[in-house]
Amino acid sequence: MSAVVAQTLHVFGLRSHVANNIFYFDEQIIIFPSGNHCVKYNVDQKWQKFIPGSEKSQGMLALSISPNRRYLAISETVQEKPAITIYELSSIPCRKRKVLNNFDFQVQKFISMAFSPDSKYLLAQTSPPESNLVYWLWEKQKVMAIVRIDTQNNPVYQVSFSPQDNTQVCVTGNGMFKLLRFAEGTLKQTSFQRGEPQNYLAHTWVADDKIVVGTDTGKLFLFESGDQRWETSIMVKEPTNGSKSLDVIQESESLIEFPPVSSPLPSYEQMVAASSHSQMSMPQVFAIAAYSKGFACSAGPGRVLLFEKMEEKDFYRESREIRIPVDPQSNDPSQSDKQDVLCLCFSPSEETLVASTSKNQLYSITMSLTEISKGEPAHFEYLMYPLHSAPITGLATCIRKPLIATCSLDRSIRLWNYETNTLELFKEYQEEAYSISLHPSGHFIVVGFADKLRLMNLLIDDIRSFKEYSVRGCGECSFSNGGHLFAAVNGNVIHVYTTTSLENISSLKGHTGKIRSIVWNADDSKLISGGTDGAVYEWNLSTGKRETECVLKSCSYNCVTVSPDAKIIFAVGSDHTLKEIADSLILREISAFDVTYTAIVISHSGRMMFVGTSVGTIRAMKYPLPLQKEFNEYQAHAGPITKMLLTFDDQFLLTAAEDGCLFTWKVFDKDGRGIKREREVGFAEEVLVTKTDMEEKAQVMLELKTRVEELKMENEYQLRLKDMNYSEKIKELTDKFIQEMESLKTKNQVLRTEKEKQDVYHHEHIEDLLDKQSRELQDMECCNNQKLLLEYEKYQELQLKSQRMQEEYEKQLRDNDETKSQALEELTEFYEAKLQEKTTLLEEAQEDVRQQLREFEETKKQIEEDEDREIQDIKTKYEKKLRDEKESNLRLKGETGIMRKKFSSLQKEIEERTNDIETLKGEQMKLQGVIKSLEKDIQGLKREIQERDETIQDKEKRIYDLKKKNQELGKFKFVLDYKIKELKKQIEPRENEIRVMKEQIQEMEAELENFHKQNTQLELNITELWQKLRATDQEMRRERQKERDLEALVKRFKTDLHNCVAYIQEPRLLKEKVRGLFEKYVQRADMVEIAGLNTDLQQEYTRQREHLERNLATLKKKVVKEGELHRTDYVRIMQENVSLIKEINELRRELKFTRSQVYDLEAALKLTKKVRPQEVSETEPSRDMLSTAPTARLNEQEETGRIIEMQRLEIQRLRDQIQEQEQVTGFHTLAGVRLPSLSNSEVDLEVKTN
């Protein structure tokens, strides 16, 4: 590889026709396409980082950034094949994550893309005629679904995902608005368009299921789940005075019908032509962007509207208008705002809105400014600087300043600073500029326009022409290295002029074709030229003759350059080679490898060479040139490179192309270091200013100074007046506040005394309550101690009883063990005899089982044969159905043939219409020729107008002198006016004081009336409060009486409950006592309330039940209807199945019976089951009495244990009920008493049962 390295440093340009051409990476960094790169631009720090396109790419078509701002998808055409490259933006530098370029479906290019909300899926739309929508799992390069969106070759403009749902997709285009859902591996359309189709240009999701769509007729629609919910139309009114007003003219809530549609999407030129003929034109909505409050949309040329959501409805209303400002540097300022907004993007915090336009410009606006300017529309600002909007035709640089000069077919000249990466100066003209050259000093330029060659001064804020030459369509011009000469090409002739006398000193003739490139040698003694005639000439300027020539008619040269020693000429052209020419001979030809070289430049050191290609790449080579393919190739532009230059110090490479972009590159040698050339003098900072401009500015400064002095005096006087007024107001306020403070102090003192009284009262009350509580506690402790002593004595007695019962139970257990051992011996003898009998029976049963298994196999075979016959019948039935379906398909094919014939006839009609259109186009071309001839006449008239303008300027100078005299008289008038104003100001303070005093008197009278009203209101409030106080006193007395009654009731209940506790060991008496308590204390009214509540619940229950029964009845009817529809098909099959199931059930019963017999026999063998008492009595009645005695005793013990357990559970339940009653009534006196254990009583109960 070559040792010469070029690194992208900065780019000036934008490719606005890439779909989705601007994004925010974060709050400071935006991403946009420029050349064949994507640029990450930091708005605050002004740096750029680059994501280059793919190798051999023919340019980017569409971009998409993932919602998590981690991935960037780029659609390109690489070697005439479509490809999608996905970059990871978080890595530094950005690296390729995936490349999607192997497709098993037809595709020409991808025109729109979108990432899913979780960034895992990618949606891509192909161009017509395929118009396929592809749904990718891009990490695995897997196509999840593909569907054809349109079959009529209508363009599709945009695809997108729902912001919350990976499976929901929206597609808009000419005559189509489709919502699709990904399910079961396919994309299915979920909504179908109603009404007449519109040309939908753009859309955005404003909610999970709501979409705003814009059309080419200025209409906005809101769709919710595919149904139209809202519609509005935007109209641009263009009155004759040039002002425009933007009005919403129609708003409806139509849900069914769409409004009528006009013509399909026109081009930008057609739209401008149409608007010039009519006073009313419909704006086209090219871009829509959603944000938290609503959405922003483009509304015709140079305008953006903000819509906000209405609070009470799900509709939107226009809230703000933002315009592209008029450009004062433009030749026609009215045209500067007539550019369509193609893309809109909000920053992540929604503080900034960025827009890109059809003229390759980037604008931004801070959203807070739109809120400030409520009355009038807000205006955009340039995000960076104005950019070229057409191919760059000329490129130049100088020695004394870091300037780059460019000219373009957009009729503008721009000067850039490659050190600060800013735009220094620009100006637009009426004619297109084809070539430009910058003087080495940086103070002059020469520009070749369509009509003339102009020599211009570069002033501090303007570019002014001071000499014109009648050279039409000058394609190349160049200052000499010394700056004393410049050359300009006029067709096939080179004119050489001197910059001192500005005269033509030589005309170099010899080319037979158009000259494409000229270059000076180092000492300006020679000029080298190359042209389309295949000739490269070296001219001697002192003689004006050719010194060397090299002619190759098969090659059309695009660019030539010369080595620093002027011995070798390098030329590139249409024959795909780079030629070294010396002494009229071609020394070497180096292949360009399937591309055409369009530009070439060699460094001043002679060690590096750079060439530009027709595909937009640059190649860096070392010199002398190698024979092999040894160079570094870099992706640069999206079109052929038109111009290339190296700065004088060989530090920077400059490239310009037909895509309207300008790149600056940093150049390095083989060690990676910049190629440094020592500069003896730094860059110049001087600028040119005309004398008249300086005088005007000085005059303006003097006027402003006098105005500043006058304003100072005026402000000082106003300040003094304000100080006096404010000092008086402060004094009044201080007096007022002092009085208020004193009144508040007295109030505070009164409140303190009241607080102290209340504190004393509360303290005494608390002490009384504490004494009362302590006395009650002592009483309760005495009662509890006595109860505890009684319970402890009971507990001792019960413990003695439990010991005696435990000894008796141990004796019974020993007796039971002895009887158990005897019973076991008797049972073993009995079961051994029984076992012998069962073995014989088991052998017999096994033989029976074998016989039954054989019978089962035979029945199984019969069932299988019956099933096979049934399957065969079903097969014949469905084959018959298949034949019927095939016949219906053949019938439908015949119908499709008829439809195809109709389609072919319609196609012929379409072809006839296209022929008519072609004839009309021919007539249009003729008319355009007439228009061009008329335009030439107009240019001649313009020249006459210009000459008359010069005479007018002379007259205007005289008028200017008279205006100066008028200004002097105006100044004298101004002094007199000032004196009059001062006298008026002396009178004004007295009048102001009188007016202020009158206002104060009126305010005091109003305050007095307010005080009277407040007094009357307060008196009424006091009477109301006294009445309320009396009512509350009476109510308090009633409540206290109720409280005393309840306390008495609670005491009576406690005593009765205490009496009940004495019967806690006797359940029957306890039950009677509790019933008595219930009858005594529970009133019937309570029961009635409970019953009423139960009846309400019952009514609610029955109402709900009736509602459910009605629903169930309707559902049953539906089920019955559906069952009747399908019942006839299944009746026969069900009858056959029933017969088969019956046979299978009978076989299962027999099998179950045999299995149970086998299981019983096996259990008998293994002694797993016990013999029932009845069976034992039948087999051996003699041993019945011996076996039943111990078992009966065991059953009695189990029963007594069960009874004890049940009684224990009942006691526990009663205890829980007592605790709940204590918690409800607040009876806590027995809370600390621990009752004795009931184990002894339970033991007594067990003894009694035994």
From Swiss-Prot:
WD repeats lie at residues 105-148, 151-190, 195-233, 336-375, 387-426, 428-470, 472-507, 510-549, 552-591, 636-675. Belongs to the CFAP57 family. Induction: May be an IRF6-target. Associates with components of the nexin-dynein regulatory complex (N-DRC), a key regulator of ciliary/flagellar motility, and might act as an inner dynein arm (IDA) hub or linkage. Keywords: Cell projection, Coiled coil, Cytoplasm, Cytoskeleton, Disease variant, Repeat, WD repeat. The keyword Cytoplasm applies. Residues 691-1057, 1095-1166, 1198-1225 form a coiled coil. This is Cilia- and flagella-associated protein 57. Expressed in nasal epithelial cells. The lineage of its organism: Eukaryota, Metazoa, Chordata, Craniata, Vertebrata. May form homodimers. Associates with components of the nexin-dynein regulatory complex (N-DRC) and the CFAP184:CFAP263 complex. The keyword Transmembrane helix does not apply. Changing residue 523 to Y: Found in a patient with Van der Woude syndrome; uncertain significance. Transmembrane segments: none annotated. Its main location: cytoplasm. It is found in: Cytoplasm, Cytoskeleton, Cilium axoneme. SMART domains: WD40. GO terms for cellular component: cytoplasm; cytoskeleton; sperm flagellum. GO terms for biological process: axonemal dynein complex assembly; single fertilization; sperm flagellum assembly. It holds the Pfam family Beta-prop_EML_2. It comes from Homo sapiens. It is linked to Spermatogenic failure 95: An autosomal recessive, male infertility disorder characterized by markedly reduced progressive sperm motility and multiple morphologic abnormalities of the flagella, including irregularly shaped, short, absent, coiled, and bent flagella.
